[in-house]
From Swiss-Prot:
Transmembrane segments: 7-29, 34-51, 64-82, 92-114, 121-143, 148-170, 351-370, 374-396, 416-438, 443-465, 502-524
Keyword Transmembrane helix on entry: yes
Gene Ontology cellular component list: plasma membrane
Residue ranges of every copy of the RCK C-terminal domain listed in the record: 178-257, 259-341
Keywords (A to Z) from UniProt: Cell membrane, Membrane, Repeat, Transmembrane, Transmembrane helix, Transport
Protein name according to UniProt: Uncharacterized transporter PPA2034
Origin organism lineage: Bacteria, Bacillati, Actinomycetota, Actinomycetes, Propionibacteriales
Species of the source: Cutibacterium acnes (strain DSM 16379 / KPA171202)
């Protein structure tokens, strides 16, 4: 055994990869309704790290790379919808601040009851909320061992309790009249419709505000592309595309559902999915691209990952998007030339924008701000890249630089970064977890961590319910409140809903700022 541990201690990269592989295997095993997913790397890291303290030494740079990759890519994904959702989420953000303050107060009170030191409480607060506030806590306590013990014991508690709470609420359905409908949940449908009245396309409910699109128009036996300026006459047939509720309203206005399926007739008009790989289109809205002038066609849908969206004029194209374009049959090649339609091209990572964006995030995170009473504040290697990613994700491009990554590339980098980070945390925390987990102090830390997290999380979830926001947005808000990447990953594996990442991004950045401040207050009280 000594020979093996000596070998692994001198080959840390091999050790990390073993933890990643075994953690991925553990993450696929179901424990009732719960599956650890990426968090399996954390628990395997704890097991392996407990074998020899040397496994967890000098992992700061590798761990930092993992957290930067994860947080920056999450920021890019959340940034595209964050600004539009800000008005809807300000209440959740306020609830998150209240929840963090209540957790700090409860931690101090329960800590004194169980005989824990302020250093213990500062460590467990940073650990159960899985935040970079541990750096601030260590500085405030001058590197006290109690701080690191509290962090090591409470970190896994934050993961387990967080996963359980997400499993409980992620698939719930409660009244959410103040939330927008999930694009993934609503889905899209296309209905061939017979026109029973004299009207026009612009008069159709939902057309002017981009809730429905029309493509095929059959008149007097001739098929052509419908345009916004077309008048519709009795006997015409049109294809209406949108989510089911909007399509039903449009069909009721126009006439009735046709027995004929217009999309089956592809002699004059045809349709195909094209991959967006043309750099000139990335970061631009659909409305700013002259699709009709260059192809005599029209885009009706945009598929991003597993999400199929109606082609609204304000949708910003990202590399790897798959647009469904209806064009005259002889102009399919023109549409392919316009969008690029190259899988190989979008599979390449734009190292310039990725490296520059992440570097800007690290610079932002390194800015130190001095506060009264000797307090210091910096975003750190997690919140800095996240905030920068959200900023760059919202502006999409700067001159020739395209900040967004293809959806598949973003997902791969995010998952890789997350598992590297969790594996390193597990390896570094293993010895302390093994030595203290079953002691009186260790059990007290675990109990206080679990109780305070449930209390703080309940405040955020209750706030979402009171504000009539969806359970899925509440799930993302809770994951961002905790700040645990594995919880976000688990939530996304349960529900395909873009509101989860939007809420996560909103609370993660703000929560990190508040945690860094409160953890220093805990030490001073």
């Amino acid at each position: 055994m000594t020979v093996l541990t000596d070998f692994l201690a001198t080959h840390q990269l091999l050790t990390i990869l073993i933890v990643l592989a075994s953690g991925a295997l553990l993450g696929q095993i179901k424990f009732g309704p719960l599956r650890f997913g990426a968090a399996g790397a954390l628990f395997m890291g704890l097991v392996v790290g407990a074998l020899d303290p040397r496994f967890g030494q000098n992992l700061g740079m590798i761990k930092g790379l993992g957290v930067v990759l994860f947080c920056y890519t999450v920021g890019l994904a959340a940034g595209s919808t964050f600004l539009s959702d800000l008005k809807r989420q300000w209440g959740l953000m306020l609830a998150g601040v209240v929840g963090l303050a209540v957790m700090a107060a409860a931690g101090l009170g329960l800590g004194r009851l169980f005989g824990l030191t302020p250093a213990h409480v500062a460590g467990l607060y940073a650990g159960v909320l899985t935040s970079p506030a541990i750096d601030a806590a260590s500085m405030a306590t001058h590197g006290a061992a109690d701080t690191l013990v509290g962090y090591a014991l409470s970190y896994p508690v934050g993961v387990v309790v967080g996963l359980i709470m997400v499993a409980i609420i992620a698939k719930r359905c409660w009244p959410a009249s103040k939330d927008n409908t999930s694009m993934a949940e609503a889905g899209l449908t296309a209905v061939s419709t017979v026109v029973d009245r004299e009207t026009s396309i612009r008069q159709t409910p939902g057309f002017n505000d981009d809730q429905v699109r029309m493509s095929y128009l059959l008149r007097d036996g001739e098929m052509r592309l419908a345009t916004p300026d077309d008048d519709l006459h009795v006997g015409d047939q049109v294809l209406v595309v949108g989510n089911p509720d909007d399509v039903n309203r449009a069909v009721e206005h126009l006439g009735h559902v046709s027995e004929r399926t217009l999309t089956n007739e592809r002699n004059e008009l045809d349709f195909r999915r094209f991959v967006v790989s043309n750099p000139a289109l990335v970061g631009r809205t659909l409305g700013s691209i002259d699709v009709r002038g260059r192809t005599s066609g029209k885009v009706t849908r945009v598929r991003r990952g597993d999400l199929d969206m109606l082609a609204r004029s304000d949708i910003v194209l990202q590399p790897g998007d798959r647009v469904l374009c209806v064009v005259p049959a002889h102009r399919l090649s023109d549409a392919a030339d316009l969008f690029g339609d190259s899988e190989a091209r979008v599979s390449q990572v734009d190292a310039l924008s990725l490296g520059l964006g992440a570097a800007l995030g690290l610079l932002l995170g390194a800015l130190m701000v001095a506060l009264p009473r000797g307090l210091q504040f910096e975003l750190g290697t997690a919140a800095g890249p996240l905030v920068m990613g959200m900023i760059l994700g919202s502006i999409h491009r700067t001159g020739p630089l395209r900040w967004q990554l293809p959806h598949a590339t973003n997902a791969i980098l995010r998952q890789l970064g997350l598992m590297i980070f969790l594996a390193c945390v597990g390896l570094a925390s293993g010895p302390a977890f093994l030595s203290q987990a079953v002691s009186g102090t260790g059990l007290a830390v675990i109990a206080v961590s679990a109780v305070t997290l449930v209390l703080g999380g309940a405040i955020v979830i209750a706030a979402a319910w009171c504000m009539k926001l969806s359970a899925q947005r509440a799930t993302g808000a809770f994951a961002g409140f905790v700040g645990q990447p594995a919880i976000l990953s688990y939530a996304n594996s349960l529900v395909n809903d873009e509101r989860i990442e939007s809420a996560y991004g909103a609370l993660f950045a703000l929560g990190t700022v508040v945690k860094i401040l409160l953890v220093q207050v805990i030490v001073l009280v």
